[in-house]
From Swiss-Prot:
Protein name: Chaperonin GroEL 5
Localization (cell): Cytoplasm
Binding of ATP, residues: 30-33, 415, 496
Native source organism of the sequence: Bradyrhizobium diazoefficiens (strain JCM 10833 / BCRC 13528 / IAM 13628 / NBRC 14792 / USDA 110)
Annotated Pfam families: Cpn60_TCP1
Keywords attached to this entry: ATP-binding, Chaperone, Cytoplasm, Isomerase, Nucleotide-binding
Enzyme Commission designation: 5.6.1.7
Alphabetical list of InterPro entries matching this protein: Cpn60/GroEL, Cpn60/GroEL/TCP-1, GroEL-like_apical_dom_sf, GROEL-like_equatorial_sf, TCP-1-like_intermed_sf
Function: Together with its co-chaperonin GroES, plays an essential role in assisting protein folding. The GroEL-GroES system forms a nano-cage that allows encapsulation of the non-native substrate proteins and provides a physical environment optimized to promote and accelerate protein folding.
HAMAP family in UniProt: CH60
Amino acid sequence: MAHKQVLFHSAAREKILRGASLLADAVRVTLGPKSKSVLIQKGWGAPIVCNDGVTIAKEFDLKDAEENLGAQVLRQLAEKTGDVVGDGTSTSTILAHAILSDGVRNVVAGASAIDLKRGLDRGTQAAIAALRAMATPVKSRAEKVQVATISAHNDASIGELVADAIEKVGGDGVISVEESKTTETLLDVVEGMKFDRGFLSPYFITDADRMESVLQDPYVLLCDHKIGALRDLVPLLEQVAKSGQPLLIIAEDIEGEALATLIVNQLRGVLKACAVKAPGFGDRRKAMLEDIAILTGAQVISEEIGLNLENATLQQLGRAARVVADKENTTLIGSGGDRTRIDARLGQIRVEIEKTTSDYDREKLEERLAKLSGGVAVIRVGAPTEAEMKAKKEALDDAISSTKAAVAEGIVPGGGLALLRAVAAVAKEEAACEGDERTGVQILRRALEAPARQIAENSAADGGVVVARMLEGEGSIGFDASRKVYVDLVAAGIVDPVKVVRTALENAVSVASVLLLTEATMTEIPEPKRERLPEPDLAVQ
């Protein structure tokens, strides 16, 4: 067992803060319309030029073990914020660092970390209430274009594309981003479905960067029972392998020999496959399997109707143009089913919605109707170079997530102004507190200025002057960093989704509070490498 190095109190906090500061300093340059880039060396291949906060955070790994602890906690913060809303990673990192650095200074001076945390929590609740109060619903296409454009680093073409996609499939619709075979970026809406079940094993991953299993033009096997015995699956696997096409298996569960065989064949390149659990439970699972069957043109292999897996043929399998599965969701793109049968199924579900008396059943039926009828918007990204295509795909992912978040909870003025307008609510909370709890609220109040200050500094303006002037102003009058003028930010299209700002703030306070409460660090002491001496009879003469 490796020995541990233990640091306590100020020594531990200083190291944690140092690591967090290094990551925050690398990420902060990516905030705002005048953002800069970070050049990242890869272990293989060419270096990458990146201005995406979460991508920079994922590459962060420091030599000093204690400093690395602080950096890795902030990295988790960026990843969590990105996973939830797809944007706001740089903002959450900057907020967390501002809270942590101010908090550490107060703890070293003798403040109670527990009381500081209580103050931070009180201030956060007041700030979030203020953000929700100033939110404006997103209804028009123009507003969606504004949100998507800002999130895509002011790329208007991406803003237009994302707004078109959301207009076609709705705020809850599925939007897939693929690589184009040409240099053009195009939008297409195809039949498809997304459900909340992911791959059963990470060995099915084909795209390591995005942690996804992607199957092109696969067969789709649907089964309403567990698959465990290898002998049941082998005949069908042999038929699919001969066809040269990938295979998606959707069943109640896939386990034991059957799952192991799929993984081994995947690793050896014999048969490209992915296995996922069927969505839903009980009778609802059977209904959803039938929905997928009609969409893909498959037949559900069910012993209830006399079908067994051992005798299944390729004719009983469905088809899809593309399947994308991650650890949580699976998306079927392109339908192999008959349009007439799909329309009939939609009509049947609508009749069931009209007849049901249960609100819960109605809600679930409406979900099925939306999944089956909504389709999938496919954005095919084209670019002259691989690096440009990757950057464009990342920008599209951010823009899609931000725009969906805006549709869900509304928008607020961007450029860090929304957090500055929440300062007044936090100040009221501050007046109701005392002692170290009040200090915690003050720390949050000061931290709320950090994003606006950083956006100004990234555009070569004086951050302190800009923040002071924005605080003096009213409404949505703020600093347009791209033109270095004070304008009505909402009218100028500089807006942020409430959900992104709220999530960034909540996650930042949560992570900073955890680090402030840390009294010790434990890291492994690397064992010295021992040089192996050659045997006497093998010594070089």
